Amino acid sequence: MQKLYVGCSGWSYDAWLGHFYPANLDRREFLKYYSQVFDFVEIDSSFYNAPNLFMIKRWASVTPDDFRFTAKFPRLITHEKRLSDPEKEFRYFFDVMRPLHHKVLALLLQLPPSLTAKEGLKKLRAMVHMLDSDFRYAIEVRHQSWFDKDVYKLLSDNNICLAWSQLDTIQTPPELTSDFLYLRFIGDRSIDEKDFGKVQKDRLKELKRWSDEVNRLKDDIKFAIIAANNHYAGFGPATANSFRKIVGLKEVQWEEMKQKGL
């Protein structure tokens, strides 16, 4: 493994003000500040609405050259159209993301829990030929029927990563289907957004278990992506730091930056 990227799912959280961000930091400066602390972020907002070119170009310009992103495909593709005839939406998303492609580690298809392999596998087979070769891809499934050898073969044949997801509703098997890993610490929706600035749950045992799985496959992958959601333990940056510590990476420091208002 050449590189382990550890960061958060999203960065635009007002609840982080005074905890991660300086209390008076302008929201327009959030990403620039975040990228001075972590070297990776998952773009969560693209799931709700595809970003526009202005936003993408700005994200590229305010982050360091070695900063990296992942981005979710819009829910229009996965949840509303349920993978049916996505070519038009794919083309738009790829065109929008292209100015950032040199910083994009992977694009993520997050499927809804109601989408079974029986309904979706045939659509997925047709869809893989529409994917732009400029990007790498990962897929997160939330129905047990997808954990099947035929699905794994399709993903492996196309170097599409089966994302490992720590959810309270389903357990993803640690299958390797690509030359990289994508691990997402998601949790549930029991933590209120106003409490996102502090840790609410002890998840260390789970973090350790998943770190062992990453370590098990380190010689088989080029890189690994670790994304920590606020809903997982209450404070994404702290979860990311805990994982870094477990795997032997130096913890990132934001307190000194925050006090200086950098």
Regions from the PLM with identified roles:
Residues 1-262:
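Residues lining hydrophobic/aromatic ligand-binding pockets adjacent to catalytic sites
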